[in-house]
Amino acid sequence: MLHCQHEIPLHIVYDEEAYVAKITWIKKRDGRVETYRAEKIAAAVRGAFGDAGEVPQEGTLEQVVELVEAALAEAAPASAPAESRAVSVEDIQDEVERALMRLGSFETAKRYILYRHRRTELREVRSELAGAVAEDPQGAAALEAELLRVERDFPEPVYAVSHLATRYHALTAPGQTADARMSALIRAAVELTSQEAPRWEMIAGRLLSLRFHRALAARRASLGVESFSRLVAYLTNEGLYGSYILDAYTPEELEKAAACIDPARNDLFTYAGLDLLLQRYVIRSHAGEPLESPQEMFLGIALHLAMNEGRSERLAWVERFYDMLSRLEVTMATPTMSNARKPDHQLSSCFIDTVPDSLIGIYRSIDNFAQVSKYGGGMGMYLGKVRATGGSIRGFEGVAGGVIRWIRVINDTAVAVDQLGMRQGAVAVYLDAWHRDLPEFLQLRTNNGDDRMKAHDVFPAVCYPDLFWRMAEESLDQDWYLMCPHDILAIKGYALEDSYGEEWERRYLDCVADPRIPKRAVLLKDLVRLILKSAAETGTPFAFMRDTVNRVNPNPRAGVIYCSNLCTEIAQNTSAIEEVSQEVVTSEGDTVVVTTTRPGDFVVCNLASLSLGRLAVEDDTEMGRVIETAVRALDNVIDLNFYALPYAKLTNHRYRSIGLGVSGYHHMLAWRGIAWESEEHLSFANEVFERIAFHAIAASERLAEERGAYELFEGSDWQTGAYFAKRGYVDGADAGAGVAPAAG
């Protein structure tokens, strides 16, 4: 096959006076007139020589081009009007054949003739397929142009449009609508996707993009929306965009921002990725019709994230945020992608609440979860303080229902509060490995047993102390003692869950030795068997190593880390919300009940993910640029966020925690041919993640210099330098050197 995109060597020079003045335009097969480019002839001829297994002698390409131009110039005298000197593609190709034969390159001429024949066949397949799918000439022309792009970008025989046509005809029947036919064409591309031909998924994505953008253009034309600034105004009037965007940016600024949009980046989507984005994330009318394109979605998010930047540099940050998103280098958290630019702009993904051991506190935590879920957040809930089954209530022994009953209420809340039908609520429930309800907890999602003790829509997670695994390693035939946290607090005067490490072990063994505390002895091997059985059947429980996490807590003076979030990725101090008082107050003739609460630490984390498969991870400068942009966007989320709960806002501003994760890890390795089970993998991963950590911390430090350190910086491991010492990043001489990050 010829490769017409190649350029001829720069030393080839044409006599402009003799030829170019006479051949100025070329008429394409679809009637379009383009500027004549002699180098395209040379590139096609070079390709023909290559197909024939020959290398053209020096000067041959120039001779062919000169012969072609001379013949064409003779056919169109210089005195003729410019439009009549526009020669057709077919005329040029005919003259190329004659020129090759005049020069004695018969095998090359034969290859060139075969090439023309193949191109004719491909054109016929494209034209026939486009005509069969589309309902009007404009639609057929647009589809044929897209199929031509597919041929050029995917030249391998396995991606021939003829394969698509064959599969399409097998999926269609007479009488189908144009939309159904286009759906069948997209489905045909999806079904052609295989291990041997994986890029059909990219082709399917392009076809889906074509259908979506044509429908969107028609819809917008009917609404009279012709520019991005008018689109923002229309969406704002409809209550689909937050008015804060128009308050922050002038129409002129919006149009300048819109100039950043690069439609070519739609080609980066796979079918599955684009379909998900169109279904979940682009703004739709109240009737469910899409009103913005994927690139406009990325720009809208960028505009929101850059709102509070200084006016002189704000649009520059808009462009940087747009670039990292539209190039798919960084993916913001689902709520940010979904809610940024909208009236209810809850941008954070993950929240953690500590459930207190009181009826009011438990229901407050469940209500908190409902509010978080309503706006797209996921939740981690620590139930380690809730008394176990058979515990006492107000001195009455054996009446407590335990944590399972409350988890079932949490489960039903997750199902009921489904984020406007977008997706079911998501929650992880955490319990300590020494809690008396642990055996039942481990069977929450298994398929056998009493269904009244099941909760299939939550994600159980266990908080393990080091002692548990140390004893398991020593001997699985030892007893492990399960206890009720309420009993321990009532008898010993301390909450066992409030400690970790050596202090926890000392207290745990003290409780085991105290005969006043009821205990449930379970063989370690039976407990481990339950854990493995549940993991094999359900993929849960998640594992959270509390001692390890608390040892490296950068804010140890501010509290204890009880658990993590839905994804087991956040490690941050948590504490329960406490009710202080409730009083009846009469003011100006209106009687109200005022409840006063102490907020505790209601953890919020603001997340983004580096797409390692799309980043040049070896390029330190490029990684630094992308990471700095992502960290700044995440820090902006904290201030721009809509908070459904005041507790969340207080904690988020106190700690300013951000989470920069990764995706596309296996993709990164596959691109580089790095085997999973290899030393090269380990050393490469270490290098990549050290680079990510370095640039993230450096970006946070620069933000602290610009905006100030977070509230709890004084006395933190960041301030003392212990953060780096605990991780082995400094020698003894540097252990006291601190850094002031914007986030804790």
Show where each model-derived region lies:
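Extended catalytic cores of very large enzyme megasubunits
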Residues: 2-4, 11-744
